[in-house]
């Protein structure tokens, strides 16, 4: 984690915690792919599996935060931050079908399901509860960015 600054570590911790809804201290390899893709990292499933195999030091098939952060560090750099923000803004705009500055909780659930079909309804509800801070039933760009960047 030497190559990550404090803000990046916090953002990764928040993303990790959002998907570790049962507080087990680990996430699945599939979830790693979901988080990286949501953060704008373009990676093939095959390359992702190779990187996860290298990173899952204890061979448990479960990715602890330290392992996840080490893996993510390979893909994140400060120069990428602006590009990441731009990509996230574009992704948000695509899903903001009405162009009104927000997406519905239902749309966010669809996005998350599309990214990881193993998420249960309880997992999704936990993520939504954390993201929709004002309980409005909609996710504005700032809430979306907080979810993605911490």
Curated annotation (Swiss-Prot):
Gene Ontology MF annotations: calcium ion binding
Q: What else is known?
A: This protein binds two calcium ions.
Cytoplasm recorded as keyword: no
Binding sites annotated in the UniProt record for Ca(2+) 1 = 56, 58, 60, 62, 67
The entry sums up its family as follows: Belongs to the troponin C family.
Q: What is this protein called?
A: Troponin C, isoform 1
Q: Name one Pfam family in it.
A: EF-hand_7
Query: Where does the signal peptide begin and end?
Result: none
